[in-house]
Structure formats: C-alpha cells, structure tokens
C-alpha cells in the first residue's frame, strides 16, 4: 500500500519565479475526491541543487574531464570557478528574497565575477535608474546565473536551459526517431541531478502513480527521462503524461515507442482523465492513449462529462517550496520583468476563450474552444483561500483573454470585500474597456494587461478575425494607460499575405503607440502556422501552401508552409527587434524606419499623426449612454455641512461637500437643495447591494427636482472631479 496515491510532477524546466499551476490545480481537484496526492516542481529542485556550492563544485569537476574545447568566454568562467563557487549560494539567496543588503555590493561590481552577459552601464541606467537598486542587483545576479548556464550548455550539456530542456527535440518532432536516439545516450550531469532528486521524492512519498505534467516542448525530454527512470527502478509505479504539450502536439500519435517511457498519455483538461485512470475501469477511460499489443489505442468514453469549473476545487500549492523560488529579471522589458519577478498565484477566470475566433489560434482545441466562466463570487472565494494558503496577494489570471464583463464583476466583488490584491491578465483591446472600466480595474488592484495587437494593419486584423481595429486599439490602450495600468502588446509579423509595405506600416503604428505613451512594453513574434488553427485547418483561404513532410507518427503542431502572396519576412526580424528595443527606452522615434534594417524596405504610408487623430476623434460616449449603471466606489462618503451664507444681504442655504479623494481633499459648495439630492444619490450609489441606478435615472431625478440642464451639470468641476475619482458609469 503506497503512502501517497499520486505524485504530480512538473519536469524540468519552467519558470524560476513561480510554480507552473497545472499540478496545483490537479491536486486541488484530487483533494476534493479524498485522493492523497503530493507534488513537486522538479525543475526548481534541480536548479537549486545545481546552483549551489556543492553543485557547481561537481559541475566544474565534470567540465575538467569533458572533451569539449572551451572558447575564451568559457575558459574565463572555468579559470574563475572558485569565484563562482564561493558566491553562488548568496546569489541564489538574494533572488529568493534573502540577503537583500548584498544589493550594494552586487551593483558596485565588487561581489560577482563578470561574465560575457554583463551589460553596459548606460543600458543599466536606462533600465533601472538611480532608484532601482534592488531590481538592478536582481538583473545582475540573473545575468551571472545565465553566464553559468551558457557554460553548462557549451561544455556540459547542450540541452540545458533555465526554462526549457532539450526544447528543440520536442518542438513539433513529427518523428520520434531523434528524441528516441537522444534518450538512449549516456546520462548527462543534469540528468543525474534530476534522477537523484526524483528518487528522493519517490522514497519520501512512495506513490502508486506518477503523473507528469508537460506544458511545453522544453519539458518533454526530461519527462520521458523521468518515466524511464521510474520504469527501470520502480516498475510497480504507473506513469501518466499529460499537459499542454500532449494536448496540442500528440493528437495524432501512432508511434508506440513513447510507451517505453510512460503507461498512459491523456489529452486536454486532466481532471476527468486522471479520475477515470485512478478508478481503473478501462472502458470508462477519457481522452487517454494506451499501448495494446504494440499498437497505440485511443480510449475516450464521450458519455462521461468534464468536471465543471466550479467543482474543481482551489489550486493547492502544498508541498511546493514557495519561499525557494527565484525572482529573476532576465531582460529589460517591463512585462517580461513582471512575468519573471515575484511569485504569482495563477488562476483561471474562465475555461477557454470568450472570443475564440482568431485565425492563428488553436480554436479547434478544447482549451480554447469550450468557454465556461466562473462567477465573480466563485473567483473571489478562490482568491481569498489562496491568499490564506500561500500568504501571497499577487494574482496572474492566465486566461487566453479575460472576459471584460467578468473582470468588471470581479473588480466590484474585490472592492465589496475590501480585498487587498494585485493582479494582471491578458485582454483583447475591445471597446468594452472604457475609461471608467479601466479605472475600476485599477482600483481593484490591476497593474498591467497584455493584449494582442498582432499585425497593426486593419486589413490583416480583419483577415485574422481579431474583432478590433487600429482606432479601437489606440483608444482602449489610452484608457488603460490613463487609468495607470501598464500595457504590453503582442505583435506579429509574417501573417499569410502580409506585404513588406504592411510590415513597415505596422512598425510605424507601433512607433506612434510608444511615442504617445499608449503602450509601455511589446514583443514581436514571427507568425507560426499551427495544425489546429483556422489557418492550419483551411490553408486555401489564406493564400498559403502546406509544405510539411509526411507525418512521422509522433508530434504535430507547427506546420511548414509557403506564403504565396506575402513578402519574404526573413529580412525583418532583427530590424523589428532593434527598433522596439529603442522605443521601449524612449529613443529612436525620430529615426527613419529604414535605419533599423540592413536591406531596403518601403517607406511608410502611415501619416505622422495617425494615432493622435484617433485619440482626438474619440467622444465620451459613456457619458451619453443612459443605460450605464452608476457606482460611487470611494472608500468613504464625503463629509457634508449645511449652513447659511450671506450674499448681498440675503441668507442662502448652502451645502459644503468635503471629498477625501486618494490624492487629496477637495471642497465644493452648492445650493442646499442640490446638496441634499447629491448626498442621498452618492449614498445610494455606494451601496453595492442596493437598487440599480442608471445614468438615465440620475438625469430624471435631476430634472424632477427642477435643477436645470443635466448636460450643463455634467460639465461642472464637481461632476468632472467625481468622474475622475470614483463615480463610474459601467
């Protein structure tokens, strides 16, 4: 009898700063069934063992006998190995939030040995300034570790990487041959570290099942190595593999050799398949591959429904060393820094994407195509429980695109409960994000959003079926930025039929977005054709020709293709990267776009004030929509004092309002009759459980009291001040 029914494992390597959420979500669900589970982030455990005094000592011993000739950069690290060995424990401790006083030594350059990645002082001053001592030190320690990682990759193990391991072998490996051959090679130093940690976990937990969550191609090699180790040393333990990689890449699996490493492979959401596996009745297996008589069989009892989102329990991080994760800053990109620095509770607001129509996205797969939201109350309950369990108040909502109306309800629920949280998420830059909604999200704790601008061309946005326009994107990013929320834009180039002119015009749009402060962070991605996207399913609609080789029986997702109508985009990548790097620094806006490219490119056809014009033309339509509900969401109501004021010998009843806004106090005086109405109105609007009051209702009340023109009232300093400080129309 095993002490633990299931050991959930995230194999090396994923993020260093926070756990990948899959095992915590599965543990939360299995807990509701009374199934005893344990979990481990094997990647973090291996990193901590490797980047330690003993780990580096052994690593350099291995390097000494390696037949690889070292280049000058690696030779320098090897010669300075005592410096690295003596500093690594404190460097790691700094990234874990301990030893913070070391920041001064690190930034002065008197503590860490300097390797090839150490940046120019000018770049450091731009990225962190004079006030960002802790972040600057964090960046330098990250580069120090990356120098060591480069050494490991060049001398010890070519597959090593902080957030991926042998990623090339797993990325759309149509045939299993190369990966199979690599798995049969002698174990590397990193492999042996992984096996050592895995053995300790197994001896500690004594599980009956080991379930490997493989989110990315960079986790596949190590996952299969783990499976092999289990089968060779613990043959009674059954091994299952699932996660994002299997769900996207292995939907046509026919090569039985993979079952030399695992017993089962499951697809899509893991809750139901795992529950059915543990029940043991093969005829009730759900979305599960097995190997029977040397043949791959797919078992899927479609009569068994998936577990509803509300019944999946709360993600449970028990067993993961939350205080041991490393907050790193790899590159000076604001959103990437947010992604990798700090520990975030990861949570999903809704299963699938509420839009689900983008031509490049895997809309035919369950994780995108089946939309099932939680309620705001359910999400807030989950957040409160996670805060209690982890002690962390930061949340990353990992939805493909968070539904705006659900975000609105969640923000109201957070404010209603007076929760103190910080959160960020992915969005679509759609018209629902009014300035009022963005201010509400900011007040509830939102600090950043990322969204897909993709190809900044209205023709291509329409072809992609993005459901947004450049005008809309400009106005919505302005709303987020005006509310104090950082905006990161996902950018794409090389979409089918995209011309060189459109790529350059897209860059000009991006330049203007940065120039006008609408976007603070961005990243260019080269379009990749995937098998499960509308483009991959219907290539004839997008002027492309599929050129992939015959399927080899293992993985299929990224597809080779030829763009018949579009430009050759190989020449654009470096120029797009360089220009964006400068725009994020606030530099290079005056340079002609040609300066960023080595090859001749077309001149842009976008007018210089293209984006500014969109902002100038925007109307405050929210204030004209009488059906919008009014909320007054300041923590306290104003203090009101009534008195008589003498004016030209006459006594006039007056109301004085003292508002305690977040940025200071403001006083307003108005007629006593108006004051009584406004005092009552703000009281009603601040009651989140009270009767709905729309802007039309407010206007009707105003007119019924014979106060005059409501349109004129909405132009007064009092109304404008209220609108900027907590009176939202939603």
Regions from the PLM with identified roles:
Residues 189-250, 254-261, 377-380, 384-387, ...:
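Secondary-structure-rich domain cores
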Residues 6-14, 209, 236-240, 248, ...:
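Conserved SAM/AdoMet-binding glycine-rich loop
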Residues 339-377:
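Canonical Radical SAM [4Fe-4S] cluster-binding loop centered on the CxxxCxxC motif
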Residues 39-51, 246-255, 459-464, 493-501, ...:
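Flexible glycine/acidic-rich beta-alpha junction loops that bind and position SAM and/or redox cofactors
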Residues 253, 437, 497-512:
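Catalytic cores of alpha/beta
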Residues 2-11, 31-32, 46-164, 179-183, ...:
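Radical SAM enzyme core and accessory elements
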Residues 179-182, 296-346, 647-652, 662-668, ...:
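N-terminal [4Fe-4S]-dependent radical SAM core
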Residues 13-16, 21-55, 76, 83-86, ...:
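Glycine-rich beta-alpha loop elements in corrinoid/cobalamin-binding modules
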């Amino acid at each position: 009898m095993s002490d633990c029914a299931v050991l959930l494992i995230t194999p090396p390597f994923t993020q260093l700063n926070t756990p990948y959420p899959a095992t915590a979500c599965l543990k939360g669900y299995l807990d509701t069934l009374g199934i005893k589970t344990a979990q481990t982030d094997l990647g973090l455990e291996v990193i901590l063992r490797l980047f330690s005094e003993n780990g580096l000592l052994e690593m350099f011993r291995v390097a000494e006998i390696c037949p690889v000739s070292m280049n000058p950069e690696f030779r320098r690290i090897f010669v300075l190995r005592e410096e690295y060995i003596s500093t690594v424990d404190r460097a790691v401790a700094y990234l874990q939030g301990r030893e913070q006083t070391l920041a001064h030594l690190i930034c002065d350059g008197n503590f860490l040995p300097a390797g090839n990645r150490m940046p120019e002082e000018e770049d450091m001053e731009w990225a962190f300034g004079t006030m960002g001592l802790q972040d600057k030190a964090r960046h330098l320690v990250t580069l120090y570790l990356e120098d060591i990682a480069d050494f490991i990759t060049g001398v010890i193990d070519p597959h090593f990487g902080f957030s991926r391991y042998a990623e090339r072998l797993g990325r759309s490996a149509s045939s299993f041959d190369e990966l199979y051959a690599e798995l049969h090679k002698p174990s590397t130093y990193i492999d042996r570290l992984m096996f050592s940690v895995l053995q300790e976990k197994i001896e500690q937990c004594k599980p009956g099942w080991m379930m490997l969550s493989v989110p990315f191609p960079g986790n596949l090699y190590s996952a299969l190595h783990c499976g092999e180790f289990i089968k060779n040393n613990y043959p009674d333990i059954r091994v299952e593999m699932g996660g994002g990689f299997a769900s996207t890449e292995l939907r046509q699996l026919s090569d039985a050799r993979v079952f030399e490493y695992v017993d089962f492979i499951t697809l899509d959401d893991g809750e139901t398949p795992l529950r059915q596996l543990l029940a043991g009745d093969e005829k009730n297996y759900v979305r599960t591959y097995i190997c029977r008589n040397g043949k791959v069989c797919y078992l899927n009892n479609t009569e068994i429904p998936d577990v509803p989102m509300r019944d999946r329990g709360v993600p449970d991080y028990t067993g993961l060393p939350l205080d041991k994760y490393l907050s790193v800053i790899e590159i000076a990109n604001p959103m990437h820094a947010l992604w990798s620095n700090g520990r975030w509770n990861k949570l999903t607001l809704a299963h699938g994407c509420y839009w689900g129509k983008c031509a490049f996205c895997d809309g035919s797969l369950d994780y995108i195509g089946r939309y099932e939201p939680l309620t705001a109350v359910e999400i807030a309950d989950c957040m409160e429980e996670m805060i209690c369990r982890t002690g962390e108040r930061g949340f990353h909502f990992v939805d493909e695109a968070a539904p705006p109306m659900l975000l609105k309800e969640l923000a109201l629920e957070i404010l209603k409960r007076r929760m103190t949280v910080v959160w960020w998420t992915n969005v679509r830059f759609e018209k629902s994000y009014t300035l009022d909604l963005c201010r509400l999200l900011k007040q509830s704790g939102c600090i950043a959003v990322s969204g897909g601008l993709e190809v900044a061309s209205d023709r291509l946005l329409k072809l992609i079926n993005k459901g947004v326009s450049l005008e809309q994107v400009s106005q919505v990013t302005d709303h987020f930025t005006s509310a104090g929320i950082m905006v990161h834009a996902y950018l794409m180039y090389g979409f089918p039929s995209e011309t060189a002119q459109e790529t350059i015009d897209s860059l000009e749009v991006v330049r203007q977005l940065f120039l006008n402060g609408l976007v603070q962070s961005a990243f260019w991605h080269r379009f990749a054709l995937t098998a499960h996207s509308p483009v991959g399913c219907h290539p004839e609609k997008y002027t492309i020709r599929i050129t992939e080789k015959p399927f080899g029986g293992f993985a299929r997702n990224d597809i080779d293709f030829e763009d018949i109508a579009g430009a050759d985009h190989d020449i654009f990548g470096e120029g797009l990267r360089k220009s964006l790097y400068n725009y994020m620094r606030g530099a290079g806006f005056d340079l002609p776009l040609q300066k960023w490219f080595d090859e001749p490119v077309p001149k842009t056809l976008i007018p210089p004030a293209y984006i500014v014009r969109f902002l100038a033309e925007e109307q405050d339509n929210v204030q004209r929509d009488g059906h919008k509900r009014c909320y007054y969401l300041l923590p306290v109501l104003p203090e009101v004092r009534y008195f008589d004021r003498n004016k030209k010998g006459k006594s006039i009843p007056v109301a004085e309002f003292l508002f305690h806004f977040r940025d200071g106090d403001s006083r307003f005086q108005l007629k006593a009759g108006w004051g009584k109405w406004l005092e009552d109105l703000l009281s009603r609007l601040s009651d989140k459980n009270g009767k709905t009051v729309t802007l039309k209702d407010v206007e009707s009340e105003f007119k019924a009291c014979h106060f005059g023109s409501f349109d004129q009232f909405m132009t007064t300093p009092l109304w404008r001040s209220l609108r900027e400080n907590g009176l939202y129309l939603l």
